[in-house]
C-alpha cells in the first residue's frame, strides 16, 4: 500500500518490481539553490516534472550551467507542452528564451495546485517525456530540440511550433 508513500520512493519501488536488477537512487528533498548543483552535475539528463515556475527556472539555469540536457513538460487543466533543451545543440533555446518571465511573474503563472490538471493530460506529457528521454539517451530519432509541442486535450490535437534561442537571454544568451 503506497498511498501515503513519497512519490519518488513509490516510483522506485514500482521500478524495482518491474526489474529487480536495476539500481534506483531517489532524492526526496526539495530542489533548491543549495542542492541544485550537486543534484544536476552527476546526471546525463534531467526530466522536469516540477509544478511551479520558480523551480522550473532554477532547473533550467542549473542544467544549462552544467551542460545537462533538460526535458521540459508542463500540464495545466487539459493542456500540455513539451520540448527538449540541449545546451550543446546550436538550435536549442532554454526555458527562459521561450518563457521570459521574471521573478515577479512567478505568482501569476498558473500552477496545477491552483488551476487543476486532468490526470490524462499528465499521463500524456509523461509518456512524451519518456520518449524524448529515450531518444536523447540513445541518440536515435529526432528529439524536440528547437520545437515546442503543444497538446490541447479538449480537441485531442497537437501543434508544433519552432522556438529559438534569444541572444539576449540571461541564462543562455550572450547578453
Each predicted region: which residue ranges?
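Adenine nucleotide-associated cytosolic modules
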Residues: 1-175
